[in-house]
């Protein structure tokens, strides 16, 4: 019962924040870039929560189940990408743009802008679709596999999609940013609390080593030697390139209250990503030593929340996992929405129509 209660309270709180911020939306700039009002700390929270999506809590955690301590190498690409972004953030904010296609259009013309809008729409709507699927899979796993609910996977996916769309529509980046901060704080707190509990239950490093040995996975205690150099490149290069071109990050730069704020937030983001990714992988690594069912590979943290943690801590971890997926999904939904609004306004300007930014 406590799992239902905590998750329900969490989702209701998200909706309340969305409704409370919706009255602040007066024009497209408010909706798309939060009126360019976000402080460095709010920016750090929203960028971290956006980057830490299903790839972290399901992908990296699931891979860590397979390769063990070598999983700590998986986030390196994203970390290096954030360092590179520290050189870009200030220039992006100084451009005073709303979207990445707008930047491309100002440099290469309208055709390039339209092509970039099409590319973003195609890519990001695909990403949103599998965030819906991931959200549905998590809800299904929580309520069907662990709580015995009759909820089907399709129903769970529809619930996830409806919630994500409704929440994004409420107040755009303004609501997304502030709930992302709450998600970020919840993530750090939850995974820090869970880490020593799981470590103690696993019997420390000695118990983990014995467990991995009994499962025929002794290399899971080794950081190096499991992945070849080519494997490391294969796992890290895509995330490095993704974060460099991630329109979500640029939208946050545009939303910063100043150039210096954007630069400071991106610098702090590096440390936030290092801490959060390491906590997720550490929790998954320790938990994997206690799980014998290979079918739980991609849901290792969900399984751990139910089976290895006290109910209240486990319920908060489940709410955190759902929140991570929601943060990523609504961000990837907001980007194409903003691009379409900008393109539509640009077309109206070409026709001599001036809405004064009131299309929202």
Which role does the model predict for each range below?
Residues 2-21, 34, 62-102, 187, ...:
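Extracellular loop-to-transmembrane helix junctions
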Residues 16-27, 85-101, 166, 172, ...:
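Juxtamembrane interface elements at the cytosolic ends of transmembrane helices
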Residues 110-119, 260-268, 344:
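Membrane-interface alpha-helices at helix entry/exit sites of multi-pass transporters
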Residues 342-348:
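Conserved small/polar residues in nucleotide/adenosyl-binding loops
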Residues 49, 72-171, 238-239, 323-330:
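Helix-loop-helix module between adjacent transmembrane segments
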Residues 11, 50-51, 78-82, 120-121, ...:
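Residue-level recognition of pore/gate-forming positions within transmembrane alpha-helices
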Residues 33-38, 42, 59-69, 105, ...:
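Loop-to-helix junctions at membrane interfaces in multi-pass transport proteins
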Residues 1-57, 168-171, 184, 190-196:
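Membrane-interface "cap" regions at the ends of multi-pass membrane proteins
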